[in-house]
Design a protein with these regions (language model features):
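Short, basic (Lys/Arg/His-rich) helix/loop patches that form interaction surfaces
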Residues: 15-26, 36, 86, 102-117, ...
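Basic, Lys/Arg- and aromatic-enriched nucleic-acid-binding interface segment
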Residues: 1-46, 54, 81-83, 91, ...
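Conserved small/polar residues in nucleotide/adenosyl-binding loops
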Residues: 184-189
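Generic alpha-helical secondary structure signal
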Residues: 5-12, 59, 131-138
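Residue-level detector of conserved, well-ordered beta-strand and adjacent loop positions
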Residues: 6, 14, 61, 89, ...
């Protein structure tokens, strides 16, 4: 079952990550996921060209995927509405600034015309969903050992997206606006 983080869990998770010697390096990525509602493949595909700091939005028009047969490849959003501009909250803006400041040069890899990916693994190659799935699983295990309120049983990058959508809906965001931002499916009553 898809269970979002509670506001308390969200805050405690970020505090934990910020102060943990292993997971501090993932802090900005998790902040960005929680603040934008991006799919993990959309996050993985981001390059500096996708960030508009002046107007404070993230341009989403592609996603980075990887298969064992084909290696890395870029895919456009599945539908026309998948192309969107996602606002940067103050927290997301600051996280992106830190990411760019700390960014190291990776291998000169170009995938279907895209290069300079923001999030690289230790080998200097672009991260993909599988990197984050493993990280979230280990993060939840370590977090749950020292917190009374455990994280959901299934903890994945999609949990961050679900948390974003739930937080926005609870804050009273117009369902159509939320649908645009994160491309969630809203069932009519």
């Amino acid at each position: 079952p898809k269970v979002p983080l509670t506001p308390t869990q969200e805050n405690e998770l970020l505090d934990f990550m910020q102060n943990d010697p292993v997971y501090a390096k993932y802090y900005d990525e998790v902040v960005i996921l929680l603040e934008t509602g991006l799919r993990i493949s959309e996050l993985c595909g981001l390059t500096p060209a996708d960030l508009n700091f002046e107007k404070r939005f993230v341009n989403v028009d592609h996603q980075l995927l990887r298969s064992t047969e084909d290696g890395y490849y870029i895919e456009a959003p599945k539908t026309e509405s998948g192309f969107r501009q996602v606002p940067m909250s103050a927290a997301a803006y600051e996280a992106f600034e830190r990411v760019l400041k700390k960014r190291r040069d990776g291998r000169c890899i170009e995938v279907d015309g895209y290069k300079d990916f923001l999030f690289l693994n230790r080998d200097g190659l672009p991260k993909t969903a599988v990197n984050y799935d493993a990280m979230f699983k280990c993060l939840a295990k370590k977090y749950n050992k020292c917190h009374k309120e455990p994280l959901p049983d299934v903890m994945t990058p999609h949990t961050m997206r679900h948390t974003f959508c739930t937080r926005m809906a609870n804050a009273g965001m117009n369902p159509k606006a939320l649908q645009y931002l994160s491309l969630i499916h809203i069932s009519e009553p």
